[in-house]
């Protein structure tokens, strides 16, 4: 649910009714836009980091999210964010914010333990988007710093995207994590205006991740006792499929993937 209270003030509330069998509150924030190039956001949201992890569920291209979006870079949190847009012949969009740093599953007061931040810059060239971002969180006594870079090419019905994420843990608590996601998609419009299906989109993806830890220790300890647990083991994956986009008034996609 999203809407405007006034011209300058908007809101969004988004709920996932089945995230691995659980109902989760995803977004719950207020956004103030005092003028066209500036916006302020406060509340619970997807932090400004990565390309694919920043997409809401209905904006995803595949039935299952990439490893960057689901495991390595998947961070929603509570905080405050500022965004500004410049036009230097092409738009440059910069978003940065300070956040709780513990994620949605463990909302504690982390402000006294240091600043947890996220920042993202988008360079929107004609047909090409370049995105660079960084984030720092502290889910336990370990500081986790992430760096992400990605590029998207889009022309007509064709889109290609490649993204790389690097994750570093302080105190040498865990080895560095690497993740990659790349996909191609092509939209084929259906000529018959009376057809239930408006477009057909064949697509393919390759993604990879090394052994990954979310920064918490076995037993849930906030001290240096115990090793960081491996939440997700190293894996490679190739996904292919087709998306059937149905007619309006509601945007509805049927995603068939293997």
PLM features: residue spans?
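Outer membrane beta-barrel
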Residues: 1-101, 113-115, 121-129, 183-187, ...
């Amino acid at each position: 649910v999203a809407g405007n209270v006034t011209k300058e003030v908007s809101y969004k509330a988004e709920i996932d009714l089945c995230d691995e069998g659980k109902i989760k509150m995803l977004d719950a924030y207020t956004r103030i836009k005092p003028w066209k190039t500036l916006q302020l956001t406060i509340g619970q949201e997807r932090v400004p980091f990565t390309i694919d992890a920043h997409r809401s569920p209905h904006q995803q291209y595949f039935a299952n999210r990439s490893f960057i979006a689901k495991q390595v870079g998947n961070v929603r949190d509570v905080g405050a964010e500022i965004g500004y847009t410049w036009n230097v012949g092409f738009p440059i969009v910069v978003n940065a914010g300070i956040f709780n740093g513990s994620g949605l599953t463990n909302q504690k007061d982390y402000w006294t333990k240091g600043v947890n931040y996220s920042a993202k810059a988008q360079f929107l060239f004609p047909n090409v988007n370049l995105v660079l971002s960084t984030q720092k969180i502290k889910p336990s006594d370990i500081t986790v710093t992430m760096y992400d870079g990605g590029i998207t090419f889009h022309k007509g019905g064709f889109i290609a995207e490649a993204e790389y994420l690097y994750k570093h843990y302080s105190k040498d608590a865990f080895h560095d994590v690497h993740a990659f996601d790349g996909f191609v998609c092509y939209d084929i419009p259906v000529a018959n205006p009376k057809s239930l299906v408006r477009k057909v989109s064949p697509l393919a993806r390759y993604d990879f991740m090394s052994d990954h830890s979310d920064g918490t220790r076995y037993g849930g300890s906030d001290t240096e006792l115990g090793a960081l647990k491996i939440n997700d083991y190293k894996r490679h994956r190739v996904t292919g499929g087709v998306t059937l986009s149905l007619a309006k008034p509601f945007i509805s996609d049927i995603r068939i993937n293997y």
